[in-house]
């Protein structure tokens, strides 16, 4: 079950994966907007200000790493949590988290349904963690 009214920006250059994940996340209750490359991702993120961004690392035009750094450097998007999507089996978790990612998710082409369910659960966990931090900061 999605965090109520959560807007997700899905940045994925593979049309198949973009459409499949958009469908699965919409079915899980998220409002999904998409981008197919790094340039489009930066524009959409700035224009739509999603609650969370799912960012593929291997993108045309601008790499996911550059997009992540640009998002974190922009005051309008700096506080939007980013979940990095990667198909790389050996992820440098410390480097990704140090660059500002809230989490990473290893894409699996073997079982897209289970992968989409795990992705939705990861999104919910990150959004809940951000909401808890925001609520604690507001009370302080």
Protein language model annotation of sequence segments:
Residues 37-40, 63-69:
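Acidic catalytic/metal-coordinating carboxylates
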Residues 48-54, 59:
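Active-site beta3 strand of CheY-like receiver
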Residues 60, 69, 78:
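The feature encodes the CheY-like receiver
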Residues 15-33:
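Two-component/phosphorelay signaling modules centered on CheY-like receiver
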Residues 12:
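Conserved acidic carboxylate
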Residues 66, 88-124:
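Alpha4 helix (beta4-alpha4-beta5 surface) of REC/receiver domains from two-component response regulators
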Residues 1-7, 114-140:
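Non-catalytic signal-transmission and effector/linker regions of two-component phosphorelay proteins
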